[in-house]
Amino acid sequence: MKYLPEWLAGDEVYLLKQKLIHDNRINIWRFHDHMHMTRPDRIYVGLNKELSWDQYSIPGKPHCYVIPATTVEELSAFLKKELDVKVAQIIGKTDARVERVGFLVGGGSLGLGSEQMPMELMRNENLDVMVCGEILEWTLCAYVRDASQLGLNKAMIVLGHNRTEEVGMKYLPEWLAELVPGMPVWFVEAGEPFSYL
């Protein structure tokens, strides 16, 4: 028995997608959340590989890094290039020097049930910059903006949910191939979901 929310019954988008899946004999296995449940979190394993940041990771602090000193603008340009991001939103001074970085991929920067979590992480780990997937603009955005305008060396780079997590999913086939030897496994990039005008 499959679960179908009431609001989808008869929905044109749902019916067309269901037909596409059925006609092409596609099986879908949504595994993303399981990637986060492993230790270490496989999304961050992939992110660290892609950015070559393993050596910058703070032991025992899986979302925190100490990188070579750079500016917010330079860090943003690096992340945009490596993660294939078209647009980065910045709060704080773009010329601010940063070394201590927090990186909360996808919805992690929403706080995972505790909307103050990103701000507490920034404060408790004395982070210069928080790199985020998606944010609650009325909390984290305001906190970082206030800190920067009050003269503290604080900034935030927002890259989007999809682009910060897809890079970790890219490494799923490596892991999965070991579990199903002989079965072809590959990664298909979803790409940037937005168009920018």
Task: Locate each region found by the language model.
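Hydrophobic structural segments
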Residues: 1-197
